[in-house]
Each structure stands twice: as C-alpha cells, then as structure tokens.
Amino acid sequence: MAREKIRIKKIDNITARQVTFSKRRRGIFKKADELSVLCDADVALIIFSATGKLFEFSSSRMRDILGRYSLHASNINKLMDPPSTHLRLENCNLSRLSKEVEDKTKQLRKLRGEDLDGLNLEELQRLEKLLESGLSRVSEKKGECVMSQIFSLEKRGSELVDENKRLRDKLETLERAKLTTLKEALETESVTTNVSSYDSGTPLEDDSDTSLKLGLPSWE
C-alpha cells in the first residue's frame, strides 16, 4: 500500500512547531556535516528560529566561508551589471572593424575574379577601373624597381672599372720597377766583366828602345 504523501504546511500549534523545528534543525545539521565529510565540501548553514534565535553550522570557519560567498556574489553581480560606456564603445569599435574586414575580404575576392555573379554592369565597370588603377600602380612600382636595379648595376660597373684601372696601374708600376732593377743588374754585371778581361788579357807596354838587329847595315 502506497504511503500517503504528507502535505507540507505551517504548523499552527506553537509547541508542536518548536518540537518539529528542533528535530528538523538537528537533522539538517547532521546532513550538512555528512555532506562536508563525504564530499570534502565547505558547508555553512545559518538558521533563525521564529523567535529570532540564531543557529549556525559550518564545516570550517564561518567567517572564511562567508567571505568566499561575498566575493563570489560580488563577481556574479559584476557580470550581471549592464556593460559600461567603455565596454559598449569597445564593442561598437569591434563591430565596425569586423564589418570593415568583411567588406575588404569581399572586395579582395572580387579583385581576384571571384564572387562576380551578383554584380551588375555598373559594379563591374567600377571594379574594372579599380583593377586598371591597381595595375597602373603596379607597373609604375615595377618600373621604379627596374630603374633602381639598373642604377645599382651601373654604379657597380663603374666601381669595377675603377678597380680594374687601379690594379692595372699598380701592375705597370711593378713591371717598370722590375725592368729597372733588371737593367741595373745587367749593367753592373757588364762593368765587372770588362774589368776582369782588361786585367787578365792586356800585355804590359815596353818603354825600352833596345833591339837586336842582325845582318849588314843598309846603305842608302
């Protein structure tokens, strides 16, 4: 047989009400203590009786638990508060930037030749002019780059010509110095050779007029 569901309502009899309050209070405190031990939870209960008497239970220091509750409630209230003027302005700027990014992305896709099906003749002509203008700027920039490279190459070529001339002049100077040294060496060697030949091959001159003549004297 099913148990009849007890209807919960205020107990009119004051004595019965106080007895029930005492029993239920002890029961709920016991359940809170079990919850704290079994689940390693911080539990705090505050009960005021009908006469205004305070009853409390806490698994740790009541002040610490209430402090955590106050901090948590404060954070929730901040989240529930309407956004500040600064935050609304930031959201507005974010929406504007997102719209600009979306528009630029669409424009870029069209410049690539994509998503052109929905464009009318006027929009296509405007896109064509935009492409022509962009192509003109690209060509102009390309010309500037080419001229810059030509200038750099010409400058490098001039530097190489100057360097080549400097090396050639240096080489000619070295060759002239080498020839001068060789010529001086040959001249010195020639003088030495002539002196040696003179000392060994030239006979001494005889200053004496004495001579031996045989035969009859000639009569003129």
Swiss-Prot record:
Chain ranges of the MADS-box domain: 1-61
One GO location term (cellular component): nucleus
Tagged with keyword Transcription: yes
Subcellular location: Nucleus; Cytoplasm
Biased composition regions of type Polar residues, renumbered to the chain: 190-200
Tissue: Mostly expressed in shoot apical meristems, including floral meristems. Also detected in stems, seedlings, leaves, flowers and siliques, and, to a lower extent, in roots.
Inducing factors: Induced by vernalization in a FLC-independent manner. Repressed by the floral homeotic genes AP1, LFY and SEP3 in emerging floral meristems to establish a floral identity and prevent inflorescence fate. Up-regulated at the shoot apex by SOC1.
Chief location category: nucleus
Coiled coil: none
One Pfam family of this chain: SRF-TF
Its biological purpose: Transcription activator that mediates floral transition in response to vernalization. Promotes inflorescence fate in apical meristems. Acts in a dosage-dependent manner. Probably involved in the transduction of RLK-mediated signaling (e.g. IMK3 pathway). Together with AP1 and SVP, controls the identity of the floral meristem and regulates expression of class B, C and E genes. When associated with SOC1, mediates effect of gibberellins on flowering under short-day conditions, and regulates the expression of LEAFY (LFY), which links floral induction and floral development.
Quaternary assembly: Interacts with IMK3/MRLK. Forms a homodimer and heterodimer with SOC1, AP1 and SVP through MADS-box domain. Interacts with the SEU-LUG corepressor complex when complexed to AP1. Interacts with AGL15 and AGL16.
Record-given protein name: MADS-box protein AGL24
